[in-house]
Structures are given as C-alpha cells and as structure tokens.
C-alpha cells in the first residue's frame, strides 16, 4: 500500500471543488502546492474521495460482522456505520462485544417467551388463539389506522416544480465527452458554437448549428506545456474562457498558469505565459486587440492578442486577483481576496482609482453597459455600486444572508440594444437565492427562491426579459425579470456551475459537476 501526502491533498482539493467550496479549494490548493504536483487530474474520476471513503467504511462494517476465525456472525446484519463512528479507536472490538452480549440476551429472552407461550396455549381454545394472532396483512392500530400510514420521513422534501414549467427531455441536449467537472461554458457571439472548460485539462467547442448534420460535433482543445524540449499534456484545470467580439478566437486560462488563444476551428493561435501560478479570470476587450488576465500571483496582465506579448503587468494587489472586467478598450477593473478593487489603464504605472469598503474577499466585478457604474460582490454578503466620480460606494446593498458569488448587469438601458428598458442587476448567492435590483433606487425588486443549494451563475437573455440561474442543486431555472415568476425549469445530472444564453436568445447552455454540458432549446 502506498499513500503520499500529495495524493491525499489532491483528493481533498478535488472534493472541495466538486462540493462548491471554491474559495476553500483555492486556499488549500495554494498552501498544499497542488499546481506543482505531478498527479494527472484527468485520471481521477469525480467524487474520488467519497468513493474511497465509502470503500473504507464498508471494510470496517464487514470487519465488525466477521469472527476472529473468519466466519460470519450467525443472524448478524452488516453494521451500518457513520464515518465518524468508524474512525473511533477499537470500534470493531466494541461493536463485536456489544453484539455478543445482545445476542445472548435475545436468546435467553426468546427461550423464556417460547416457554410462556406454550404454557398459555395449552389452556386456550382455538378461537382464542385466532384472536391472539390476527392476520398479518393490513394490521390495524388501536385508533383504526393502518400501520405504516404515517411513517416518519427523515428525508428532506424534494423541491416541487410545476409541471407546466418543466422543460421536456426532447428540448434538452446533453453533451458528454469531458472526463471531469465542467466549470465554465460560453456561447460564440455570432454562431451556435458552445465552448466548455473542464477539470480534465481540456476545453471543447461544440457545434450546435442547425446545419451540423442533425447532431452536435465537438473539437477537443488539449492543453500542453513545454517540458524538456517537448510538448506534453497539461493536467491542470481550465479555469476561464472568453470569445472575442466577432467570434473568431477563444481565449482560455488554466491552472497551469498559461493563457491560450484558439481559433474557432480548434487551432492553437498563441500561448501566453508570464503568470507565476493559476489564472482565475480572463477577458477580451471589445475591440479584440487585447486580452486581460488575473492570477493567483496577485497580478493582472494585458496581452497583445496578435503577438502574444505581455503589454503590461499590474502588480497592485496584495493577494490573489479573482476577477477582471474592461471599462473600455484601455481601462479595466480588478478585484482580489485583499478586499480591494483597482481601476487601471494601459500605460499607467499606478491605479487610476482604488475602491475600498468590502470587509471580505471580493468575488466578482462588472461594469454596467455604459461603463459608468461598477458593481462588486463579496464574501461579506454585500453588493456595492461604485462610480469613478467618488471614492465611497454609491449603493451598499445588503439583503443576502450568505456570500455573494457572482453578479450580472442586464443588457438593457443606455448603451445597449434595448435602450427603452430599464437596467437591472442580478446577484447570485450561497444562500440559494437570486436577487434582482433596481440600481437607480438601490432596492431589491425580486427575490427568486426556488433553488435549494448555492447559486453559482446567472445570465440575462439578450433582450433582458429573462434570467437563467444555475445551482449546485442540479437545476437550471429561467425567470421572467419583470414579474419574478419561474417560467422554465430543468433538472440536470450534476451541480450547475455556469449558465449562458446564445446570441439569438433561444438556447441556454449549462455546465455541470458530473462532466456533462446541457443545451436547453427554449
């Protein structure tokens, strides 16, 4: 038997990721140097830690039920143990001794009961015996109710979804091919190509165009690193991806510290390597000439998309950078676990603005479509709205009861293709709710409450009339943004990490923890 600390750490790290503890997984991964291990994550199946724990538990259960000579205890059911009980010292000996004593008592009691029954039966008539032993079927209790009619249900009640809103199976396409959890997915902005990124160290481009011969085809983008003068497969997670505005190039960030740019046909165009650790976020600017990345090395980098050259590295955060977003083609904002938000501009050697006010890690930031307001969300359970015109936040929105994981602006209002509709902001939280906000008034207009687990992703339809949400409860919900009502619902086969709409607004893509990618035809 061989067990190394690297192997144990990797299984714990994967368990934290699969269970939705993204920040804990990140911290643990850094402290245990997961990125420096030689473990090939593509060979490790989902739920590996749980599986090996279950096997160990079954071994202890079987051990309790076996005599020292190897024979099984007579009339002994296999013990059902909890994990904590199983690790108690001497639990095997304690349970075996307790069962032996219980068995002796049961045998003595059975002998006494049998003797008493025989003596009693000798003095009873056949009719009396019949009354003493009524038929077993549908036994009646003293109040006339049937036994079992009101059994106690110790399981949580499953969520009930109205059948009218359930998306039928023929409207859902499940795409399989990834060998590990799929963290991210994104539609090409001009065609029905869906990109997905996974813990199996690959990204895939799925062709769902109507003319793709009736089925979906996939391109597998395998990440390689240079070792000893040769390209060898990387075994690190794909953490982020983003299409450029004309849909010709796909940029991806990885846990191996490299960003890569691929063509829509699956050809590697360039590899961007200057980060000293995993990349957590990356975005194209609108013009399509620069790619922006954020990493665990506390820096953000602007890359020339055509040459692959790092134009400028911004070392202003004091802890890992978690998210970035462009304000315009030259200026961007970044957030970090250091609780700060920096606004930086290409060519400037210091932040042009720094926003402080959050009291915990800042998970996500998003500029509104006009570039005037910046929204941020944090583990401090608040959502804040900032303006370049002032240092203090414009709104400090407090309603969620747990960490807020992500936020999205609606594609409505000024500077959008829907200028006559008012702008909204959506927030998704670990408290299992999604909230819609009127940013001008600073109030919550709707609280969407059908999910039962943390909500990891929200996305507005292109017209802003609908909002998709994805949760670790395996459900994708589609909501009406004006009424807050649930209009469509789909239960997948794994926890949902990401949801996204195609450009026409008639399909929703979702990526899941079991390695599946589903496409909902609305």
Swiss-Prot record:
<keyword id="KW-0853">WD repeat</keyword>
<feature type="modified residue" description="N6-acetyllysine">
    <location>
        <position position="102"/>
    </location>
</feature>
<keyword id="KW-0225">Disease variant</keyword>
<dbReference type="GO" id="GO:0005634">
    <property type="term" value="C:nucleus"/>
</dbReference>
<dbReference type="InterPro" id="IPR001680">
    <property type="entry name" value="WD40_rpt"/>
</dbReference>
<keyword id="KW-0677">Repeat</keyword>
<dbReference type="GO" id="GO:0000118">
    <property type="term" value="C:histone deacetylase complex"/>
</dbReference>
<feature type="domain" description="F-box-like">
    <location>
        <begin position="41"/>
        <end position="86"/>
    </location>
</feature>
<keyword id="KW-0832">Ubl conjugation</keyword>
<feature type="repeat" description="WD 8">
    <location>
        <begin position="491"/>
        <end position="521"/>
    </location>
</feature>
<feature type="repeat" description="WD 5">
    <location>
        <begin position="357"/>
        <end position="396"/>
    </location>
</feature>
<dbReference type="InterPro" id="IPR045183">
    <property type="entry name" value="Ebi-like"/>
</dbReference>
<protein>
    <recommendedName>
        <fullName>F-box-like/WD repeat-containing protein TBL1Y</fullName>
    </recommendedName>
</protein>
<keyword id="KW-0804">Transcription</keyword>
<feature type="domain" description="LisH">
    <location>
        <begin position="4"/>
        <end position="36"/>
    </location>
</feature>
<keyword id="KW-1010">Non-syndromic deafness</keyword>
<comment type="subunit">
    <text>Probable component of the N-Cor repressor complex and some E3 ubiquitin ligase complex. Interacts with NCOR2.</text>
</comment>
<keyword id="KW-0539">Nucleus</keyword>
<keyword id="KW-1017">Isopeptide bond</keyword>
<dbReference type="InterPro" id="IPR020472">
    <property type="entry name" value="G-protein_beta_WD-40_rep"/>
</dbReference>
<keyword id="KW-0597">Phosphoprotein</keyword>
<dbReference type="InterPro" id="IPR015943">
    <property type="entry name" value="WD40/YVTN_repeat-like_dom_sf"/>
</dbReference>
<dbReference type="InterPro" id="IPR019775">
    <property type="entry name" value="WD40_repeat_CS"/>
</dbReference>
<feature type="repeat" description="WD 2">
    <location>
        <begin position="233"/>
        <end position="272"/>
    </location>
</feature>
<dbReference type="InterPro" id="IPR036322">
    <property type="entry name" value="WD40_repeat_dom_sf"/>
</dbReference>
<keyword id="KW-0209">Deafness</keyword>
<comment type="function">
    <text>F-box-like protein involved in the recruitment of the ubiquitin/19S proteasome complex to nuclear receptor-regulated transcription units. Plays an essential role in transcription activation mediated by nuclear receptors. Probably acts as integral component of corepressor complexes that mediates the recruitment of the 19S proteasome complex, leading to the subsequent proteasomal degradation of transcription repressor complexes, thereby allowing cofactor exchange.</text>
</comment>
<feature type="repeat" description="WD 1">
    <location>
        <begin position="177"/>
        <end position="216"/>
    </location>
</feature>
<dbReference type="GO" id="GO:0003714">
    <property type="term" value="F:transcription corepressor activity"/>
</dbReference>
<feature type="repeat" description="WD 3">
    <location>
        <begin position="274"/>
        <end position="313"/>
    </location>
</feature>
<dbReference type="GO" id="GO:0005654">
    <property type="term" value="C:nucleoplasm"/>
</dbReference>
<feature type="repeat" description="WD 7">
    <location>
        <begin position="450"/>
        <end position="489"/>
    </location>
</feature>
<keyword id="KW-0805">Transcription regulation</keyword>
<dbReference type="InterPro" id="IPR006594">
    <property type="entry name" value="LisH"/>
</dbReference>
<feature type="modified residue" description="Phosphoserine">
    <location>
        <position position="130"/>
    </location>
</feature>
<comment type="similarity">
    <text>Belongs to the WD repeat EBI family.</text>
</comment>
<feature type="repeat" description="WD 6">
    <location>
        <begin position="399"/>
        <end position="447"/>
    </location>
</feature>
<feature type="cross-link" description="Glycyl lysine isopeptide (Lys-Gly) (interchain with G-Cter in SUMO2)">
    <location>
        <position position="287"/>
    </location>
</feature>
<dbReference type="Pfam" id="PF08513">
    <property type="entry name" value="LisH"/>
</dbReference>
<dbReference type="GO" id="GO:0006357">
    <property type="term" value="P:regulation of transcription by RNA polymerase II"/>
</dbReference>
<feature type="repeat" description="WD 4">
    <location>
        <begin position="316"/>
        <end position="354"/>
    </location>
</feature>
<keyword id="KW-0007">Acetylation</keyword>
């Amino acid at each position: 038997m061989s067990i190394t600390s690297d192997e144990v750490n990797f299984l714990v790290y994967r368990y934290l990721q699969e269970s939705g503890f993204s920040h804990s997984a990140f911290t643990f991964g850094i402290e245990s140097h997961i990125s420096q291990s030689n473990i090939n994550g593509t060979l490790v199946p989902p739920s590996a830690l749980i599986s090996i724990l279950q096997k160990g538990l079954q071994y202890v259960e079987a051990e309790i039920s076996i005599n020292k000579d190897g024979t099984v205890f007579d009339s002994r059911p296999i013990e059902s143990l909890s994990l904590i009980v199983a690790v108690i010292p001497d639990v095997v000996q304690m349970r075996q001794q307790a069962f032996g004593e219980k068995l002796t008592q049961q045998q003595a009691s059975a002998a006494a009961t049998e003797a008493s029954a025989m003596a009693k039966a000798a003095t009873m008539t056949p009719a009396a015996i019949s009354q003493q032993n009524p038929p077993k079927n549908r036994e009646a209790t003293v109040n006339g109710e049937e036994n079992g009619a009101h059994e106690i249900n110790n399981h949580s009640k499953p969520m009930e979804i109205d059948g009218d809103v359930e998306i039928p199976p023929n409207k859902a396409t499940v795409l399989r091919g990834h060998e590990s959890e799929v963290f991210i997915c994104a539609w090409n902005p001009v065609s029905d190509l869906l990109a997905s990124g996974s813990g199996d160290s690959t990204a895939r481009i799925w062709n769902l165009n109507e003319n793709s011969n009736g089925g979906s085809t996939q391109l597998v983008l395998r990440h390689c690193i240079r070792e000893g003068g040769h390209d060898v497969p990387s075994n690190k997670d794909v953490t982020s991806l983003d299409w450029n505005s004309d849909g010709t190039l796909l940029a991806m960030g990885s846990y191996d510290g490299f960003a890569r740019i691929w063509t829509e046909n699956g050809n590697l165009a360039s590899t961007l390597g200057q980060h000293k650790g995993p990349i957590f976020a990356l975005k194209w600017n609108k013009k399509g000439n620069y790619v922006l990345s954020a990493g665990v090395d506390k820096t953000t980098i602007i890359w020339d998309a055509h040459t692959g050259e790092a134009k400028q590295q911004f070392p202003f955060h004091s802890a890992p950078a978690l998210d970035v977003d462009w304000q315009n083609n030259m200026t961007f904002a970044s957030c970090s676990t250091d609780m700060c938000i920096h606004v930086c501009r290409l060519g400037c050697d210091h932040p042009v603005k720094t926003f402080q006010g959050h009291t915990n890690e800042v998970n996500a930031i998003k500029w509104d479509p006009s570039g005037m307001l910046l929204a941020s969300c944090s583990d401090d359970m608040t959502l804040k709205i900032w303006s370049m015109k002032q240092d203090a936040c414009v709104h400090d929105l407090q309603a969620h009861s747990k960490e807020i994981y992500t936020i999205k602006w609606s594609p409505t209002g000024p500077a959008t293709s829907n200028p006559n509709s008012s702008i909204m902001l959506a927030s998704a939280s670990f408290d299992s709710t999604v909230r819609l906000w009127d940013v001008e008034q600073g109030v919550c207009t709707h609280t969407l409450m059908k999910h039962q687990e943390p909500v990891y992703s929200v996305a507005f339809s292109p017209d802003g009339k609908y909002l998709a949400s994805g949760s670790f409860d395996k459900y994708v919900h589609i909501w009406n943004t004006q009424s807050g009502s649930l209009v469509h619902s789909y239960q997948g086969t794994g926890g949902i990490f990401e949801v996204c709409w195609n450009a026409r607004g008639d399909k929703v893509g979702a990526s899941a923890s079991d390695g599946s990618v589903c496409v909902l035809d609305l």
